[in-house]
Amino acid sequence: FTRLNFFLDNYDGAFRLSIDTMNKNIAKYALDNNFEILNDVSGFREPGMIELAVEKSSKIILVHSHPDASHIQEKMEFKDVVQEVKAQLEIKINYLISKGIKESQISIDPGLGFGKTMRDSEILFKNLDVFCFGFPLVVGYSKKKFTEILNMTNYQLYTHCIDSGAALVRLHIAS
């Protein structure tokens, strides 16, 4: 917990905190220490993560992860990446709700770059509006290889996300 403790020791409460982890123990520690949002890039596959989110009533970011992938970076084949990712997110949302997660806890992220080719991520990025179907949309394009083929400035990438309905855009900004 060293990295978390360093951050928490210097946190002044000025903004909401989200933890990006697949590890239940780290997630629990973070939620016990002022973090409000659980972002699990595995799509909440790890044992105990769903139960923890239910117990803590934490907001969650459901990142798309192909159900047949053995790990989050395994490249999967899609016939229609937009429709398949949307359908898989809908199935996972229904599963989470059946396990006690409330709709109001859920935000969705199409998982750009996770288990997808650069072309798949490009297509998803160009069709972000499809993922605005009743849940806040979170987009993380920053530092992703596929953005190189879009030939857009960072401002244009960000504006596209907002214009497409994103509620939150995750960025990496160096100081």
What are these regions (language model features)?
Residues L112:
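Active-site metal-binding loops of divalent metal-dependent hydrolases
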Residues F1-L17, K24, L31, E36-E90, ...:
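Active-site-adjacent loop and "lid" segments of alpha/beta metabolic enzymes
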Residues E90-Q105:
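Phosphate/pyrophosphate-binding loops at sites that engage ATP/ADP/AMP, CoA/4′-phosphopantetheine
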